[in-house]
Amino acid sequence: MPVVESDEKVDDTAKDLSSLGLSDKETARGEEKEEKGTVAAPSAPTVDTVQPTTGPSWPATAPDHPLSKFYDIFEDVIKSAEHNEVYGILLTKENPFQTKLILQKFLRANQNDLDKAKQQLLETLKWRKEFDPVKATGEKFDKTRFGGLGYVLEVQGVPESKNEKDVVTFNIYGAVKDKKATFGDLEGFLRWRVGLMEKSVQKLNLASATTPVPNYGEGPDPYQGFQIHDYLQVSFLRQDPAVKAATSKTIEVLGRYYPETLSRKFFVNVPVIMGWMYTAAKLIVAKETAKKFAVLSYGNQLAGELGVDIPAVYGGTKEDLESVAEGMSLE
């Protein structure tokens, strides 16, 4: 069985690059889905509020299978957390397919360790109850702080992908005009960044999913997205404390509370010397982890990885991100 590491470990591997500060002499770029059918987060436990429905069926699993065991006890986790929503999906026995899909993601992220998966689900539910990321997707943010920093784009024709469409999130670091304004208010930055992440997850269409997520080690999860970190016009010479703090906290939050949502992560427009460093780093991490991130020195190389259904600046055929992609609401 191949070794598959969690998104949290991938983020740890890439953290040195993501957390490098931005020079005071240059502009910086800010850090790393709304879909019909998703359900807004409930304000209180609603384990029994969803009416039984007919829908897709999950393949039968043996009583001792980790997913069977998790499904038997997840309601206890919900009661403890006093919340039952993940990615806009209500976890209930009346919604077995989508519930098992979410539980399977937590199992895969923890290599089928039920205790660890249970703990991560509990922490995620508590965090979602407090932070309310679904609400964040519809909030308005200051255009002067976050304009041009992040976009979500649906693309077709990704090489080797079996999906009709894939979801790509772009983090445009060079769009930052004022580092202190963008990153200084950490909580404000997190609401923007988590809102963007939640928006991208909604685009995965989990509420209408009909294909089961494979067991850990038995194939790829089809419900994952790509993350792009564009460092054009960004200096790696200095570390800005505010940028470093915001990046570190973002990695912590997304790595812990969004398991199995990352297919691959690309760092583009990275200076050649930094590319060499990451090439060396990939030699000392697990093979499956190394597959999840790539460093590209030039933006137009991205089309070789994701196909041509991306903006021309990345080697594709589409117009610029502002024209073809979706960002957060700004005012």
Swiss-Prot record:
Q: For bias kind Polar residues, which ranges apply? A: 46-56
Q: Which GO terms describe its cellular component?
A: cortical endoplasmic reticulum; cytosol; endoplasmic reticulum membrane; plasma membrane
Task: Give the reaction(s) catalysed.
Answer: a 1,2-diacyl-sn-glycero-3-phospho-(1D-myo-inositol)(in) = a 1,2-diacyl-sn-glycero-3-phospho-(1D-myo-inositol)(out)
State its location(s).
Answer: Cytoplasm; Endoplasmic reticulum membrane; Microsome membrane
Task: Give this protein's Gene Ontology molecular function annotations.
Answer: metal ion binding; phosphatidylinositol transfer activity
Q: Where would I find the CRAL-TRIO domain in this sequence?
A: 148-322
Cofactor(s) the protein needs: heme b
Coiled-coil ranges from the UniProt annotation: none
Any matching Pfam family? CRAL_TRIO_N
Q: Does the keyword Metal-binding apply?
A: yes
This chain's protein is named: Phosphatidylinositol transfer protein SFH5
Q: Which gene is transcribed and translated to give this protein?
A: SFH5
